[in-house]
Curated annotation (Swiss-Prot):
Protein name in the entry: Lipoyl amidotransferase LIPT1, mitochondrial
Reactions that this protein is recorded to catalyse: (R)-lipoyl-5'-AMP + L-lysyl-[lipoyl-carrier protein] = N(6)-[(R)-lipoyl]-L-lysyl-[lipoyl-carrier protein] + AMP + 2 H(+); N(6)-[(R)-lipoyl]-L-lysyl-[glycine-cleavage complex H protein] + L-lysyl-[lipoyl-carrier protein] = L-lysyl-[glycine-cleavage complex H protein] + N(6)-[(R)-lipoyl]-L-lysyl-[lipoyl-carrier protein]
Species this chain originates from: Mus musculus (Mouse)
Gene for this chain: Lipt1
Function summary: Lipoyl amidotransferase that catalyzes the transfer of lipoyl moieties from lipoyl-protein H of the glycine cleavage system (lipoyl-GCSH) to E2 subunits of the pyruvate dehydrogenase complex (PDCE2). Unable to catalyze the transfer of octanoyl from octanoyl-GCSH to PDCE2. In vitro, it is also able to catalyze the transfer of the lipoyl group from lipoyl-AMP to the specific lysine residue of lipoyl domains of lipoate-dependent enzymes but this reaction may not be physiologically relevant.
Lineage: superkingdom: Eukaryota
Family of the protein in this entry: Belongs to the LplA family.
Keywords from the UniProt entry: Acyltransferase, Mitochondrion, Transferase, Transit peptide
PROSITE patterns the UniProt entry points to: BPL_LPL_CATALYTIC
Amino acid sequence: MLIPLSMKNCFRLLCQHKVPAAGFKSPPTHGLILQSISNDVYENLAFEDWIHDHIHLEGKPILFLWRNSPSVVIGRHQNPWQECNLHLMRQEGIKLARRKSGGGAVYHDMGNINLTFFTTKTKYDRMENLKLIVRALNAVQPQLDVQPTKKFDLLLDGQFKISGTASKIGRTAAYHHCTLLCSTNRTALSSSLKSPYCGIKSNATPSIPSAVKNLLERDSTLTCEVLMSAVAAEYAAHHQVDGHVNLINPADETMFPGINRKVKELQSWEWVYGRTPKFTVDTTFHVPYEQAHLEIQVFMDVKNGRIETCAIKAPDHWLPLEIGEKLNSSFIGSKFCPVETTLLTNVLLRTCPGDHHLHSKWYILCEKIRGIM
């Protein structure tokens, strides 16, 4: 049963003293089940961290249920250029987010359920949570063959991944979050999580591709609503908490003081891209020239999402040496992103007005460079 939250007392009991009073109408004594009314990935990720930072979880575990509009969420230590097809995502309006926990890249949409289990650090147990999900699935469909793995995934029929795991462990609090594939767009999932970019070298955490399947493909009655209700019921029974699913708005600043600041941080270029571990780009591409093609070499060091060193080498007869050197020096310090490259290109073109032949080469070159961003 879903009930809307009226939060004026409960968080007063759950929150640490540094947080202004805000909370639920009926204070829980053992724990809570929450469900977000937002489909915004940044708001939901921010709410996770708000709970982690502000709620006293001793004896009061929390289950948070949430879904997002199409988005890709990468782990804290990942490289988005290695993990995603950023060009496709920009075209399709698929958001990119970097979470505070580790692990690999995942695709979210309204057919993918996200489950976050909040506990104290001492009560943190990923396998227990996964077994709880398995019991919930078997309660609605006893014929399902779903098993947890040593890597804390859930496999359907011993081969199809339906859930992946990540976690964050703090000084006293911890959370384990995982996905549950119900009716996600598997075409969008596959294409979004397939990087087309070549020549990137990095020590960032790589994702491990897996064969996936939707639970709805196995049984048409296993809708997101059915699965969320089943997990909530099993969680309530296991933890002996109130089975009501409390609806919350994670963007409500009056209810969750400081949440908007967390949302803005997660949306920022500095967090999403700037937190990428240092990497290099070492690649070549070809440009048309008379009846043939010329090879252009590109080498860049990228740190904190910005170009630290740049060496673009083109044949002198195609691009004059001094122009190439100007391009290299102009890139240093700029963001490794297509928007900034476009702005930089326009600025540089104004330094040599009227040279249409050079302009066309410059456009071709910068378009190729944007293609690796």
